[in-house]
Amino acid sequence: MNKDCIFAAPIEKLGDFTFDENVAEVFPDMIQRSVPGYSNIITAIGMFAERFVTANSLVYDLGCSRGAATLSARRHITQPNVKIIGVDNSLPMVERCRQHINAYQSDIPVEILCDDIRNIKIENASMVILNFTLQFVPQQDRQLLLEKIYQGLNPNGGLVLSEKFRFENKKMDDLLIDFHHQFKRANGYSELEVSQKRTALENVMRTDSIETHKERLKSAGFSQIELWFQCFNFGSMVAIK
């Protein structure tokens, strides 16, 4: 696993964060050291797949990056005639994802598309995964995307939505942000790395509150919505049609 050193040296002109070649190369290390509970969420996605995925259906991993969630789901699918469709708009991510997926043998076909997830038609889905993806979608487009997902899910199908959260209570928000930065420092990131990455993400990652996510999901049509995992200001929700 290549180590993330992208923000280790001072960057004079710090642009917006992008999932480019450099990020794709070190992404597994970056996300493990940056997102509290990430490995737990990936493991649980497999458990959800075991429960949600039905025969003759599709599974969508929207914002699949290098395929960790896709592989976790595929390992736990027991039903016949299932296909997984992974989508990411970063070509470097897609190329590495295809290599990663192809390194493991399985009877379950996986198709990885390089596209904007907003362009994807969701149909005959028993499970949809949005694993730290929605926060990078323009806020004005999030409701419509969730509605498309709901409409494309089969009855009793499930959506797993993992996100970084913000909190309306400023004192609590600041506390959990501090804990997150402490988590990153404990994983070997310097103050400079934490600061520069936060600045780079400011204009591209817009977080929502848990309440906002629940309201959106409810408006999309979901009636069964729960926060099943949280660590500091990161967490994951499940919504069932």
From Swiss-Prot:
Recorded family membership: Belongs to the class I-like SAM-binding methyltransferase superfamily. Cx-SAM synthase family.
Name of the protein this chain belongs to: Carboxy-S-adenosyl-L-methionine synthase
Domain of life from the UniProt record: Bacteria
Keyword annotations from UniProtKB, A to Z: S-adenosyl-L-methionine, Transferase
Species per Swiss-Prot/TrEMBL record: Histophilus somni (strain 129Pt)
InterPro entries tied to this protein: CmoA (IPR005271), Methyltransf_25 (IPR041698), SAM-dependent_MTases_sf (IPR029063)
Residue numbers binding S-adenosyl-L-methionine: 38, 63-65, 88-89, 116-117, 131, 198
Gene field: cmoA
A biological process from GO: tRNA wobble uridine modification
